[in-house]
A protein has these predicted regions:
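Feature captures the catalytic ectodomains and active-site-proximal regions of enzymes
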Residues: 1-400
Length: 400
């Protein structure tokens, strides 16, 4: 049976007083997710392995069944793969955010969601001023970019900037985990401080300030790693061909290493205005020839990081009606059965504006299966589901 996973990044949350003690998933109007839960089986998944930070790379790799202690090499290496960079022996890749600092405060992790066009101009300028034979910046999407350090030591204690909005940034700068990594930590911290000097008066930032927008006035490198040794999903599970649909470099990079076809969708932004319908139709087209599709939607996570409850509810409802609804209605017409799974990768609670490692709700619908008693899809309804809590590769094996 063919299968599709629809992943609402950061969709899970905690009860919110302003919503009458409900979570955004409970409060949102989600007829299609509820219908799939009613027709299918539900439970929770532990997507963050013990000892790991609840990052999207950790959680999404877990959803796909990868053994994190064996294959995890950080976010940077995955994003390098997504832009076609072939990471070589001796090279260290890092995610490099363009962030906004205000005085000594890390104001936000995204520079007010700077456009890719603006960011590309800044990344090229950073290469001119700070690049060398050992240091190179590569443009990604919006605020999410790549830093390659030749000869870097990955044994570093780095803080994801989305975890610490409105905190003083200096105590959060990079620290070595072992004495041998001190040189790399010093190099990267100097790059952070130098970037602030050269970016503060750049024309892109002056224009943004004049328009009332946050400037991208600092880099913030984090999540270092080397080239990972990952099996493809075809090798792990035996299907012939799969695909991934996402606007996020990280997820696309996971797809590259997982052996999945990376599908581009016009208007897929990784933000609230993404092309939900286009992604759904692309998934349907892919399912005609592929055995497996991983459809990832980032919008809920971004709303959680902004701490915007109303926006998070709206993104959940958009995912339900403008993507899952299209898929559900069309797949009901197909002669060939398709299994459908829906879940978040991790919670991104609006109250704290960052990820947690709380197990997430999931549903699996397979035509002809015996459903459990759950009739709504949210963090608490699935506590009555068939599966309890699944770990490691248990979820993906149940689906496939």
């Amino acid at each position: 049976m063919k299968s599709i996973i629809i992943l609402g990044d950061g969709m899970a949350d905690e009860p919110i007083e302003a919503l009458g003690g409900k979570t955004p998933m409970q409060y949102a109007d989600t007829p299609y997710m509820d219908k799939l839960a009613e027709m299918g089986v539900t439970g929770r998944m532990k997507t963050v392995a013990d000892g790991f930070h609840p990052g999207s790379e950790v959680a999404n790799m877990a959803v796909l069944g990868y053994d994190l202690p064996t294959v995890y090499e950080g976010r940077g290496v995955l994003e390098a793969a997504s832009i076609g960079y072939d990471l070589k022996p001796g090279e260290m890749a890092m995610r490099c955010n363009l962030i906004c600092v205000e005085g000594d405060i890390l104001k936000n992790h995204s520079s007010g969601h700077i456009t890719t066009e603006e960011a590309d101009e800044l990344i090229r300028f950073l290469n001119e001023k700070l690049g060398s034979d050992h240091i190179h910046f590569y443009t990604g999407v919006s605020y999410r970019h790549l830093l390659i350090v030749k000869g870097g030591d990955k044994r570093l204690d780095c803080t994801p900037p989305h975890d610490v909005p409105l905190h003083p940034f200096r105590p959060l700068m990079i620290k070595p985990e072992v004495p041998e990594a001190q040189e790399t930590a010093d190099l990267l911290n100097n790059l952070i401080l130098q970037s602030q000097e050269i970016l503060k008066d750049h024309p892109v930032n002056l224009r943004r300030i004049a328009a009332g927008k946050d400037p991208a006035n600092s880099i913030w490198p984090w999540s270092p790693g080397y080239r990972p040794a990952m099996q493809t999903m075809q090798e792990m599970y035996g299907f012939k061909q799969g695909s991934v649909i996402s606007a996020v470099d990280l997820i696309r990079g996971i797809g590259v290493y997982a052996g999945l076809e990376v599908i581009d969708v016009e208007g897929a932004t990784g933000l609230y205005d993404t092309n939900y319908e286009g992604k759904a139709h692309a998934a349907l087209e892919a399912l005609k020839t592929n055995d497996f599709v991983y459809l990832h939607v980032e919008a809920c996570d971004e709303a959680g990081h902004e701490g915007d409850v109303d926006l998070k509810i709206r993104t959940i409802e958009n995912l339900d009606k403008r993507a899952i609804g299209i898929l559900f209605e069309e797949l009901q017409k197909w002669d060939e059965p398709v299994a459908i799974a829906v879940l978040p990768d991790h919670p991104t609670p609006c109250a704290i504006r960052t990820h947690t490692n709380t197990p997430v709700p999931f549903l699996i619908y397979k035509p002809g299966q015996e459903p459990d008693s759950v009739t709504r899809f949210d963090e608490f309804s699935v506590l009555e589901g068939k599966y309890g809590i699944l770990e490691k590769d248990e979820f993906i094996k149940e689906l496939l």
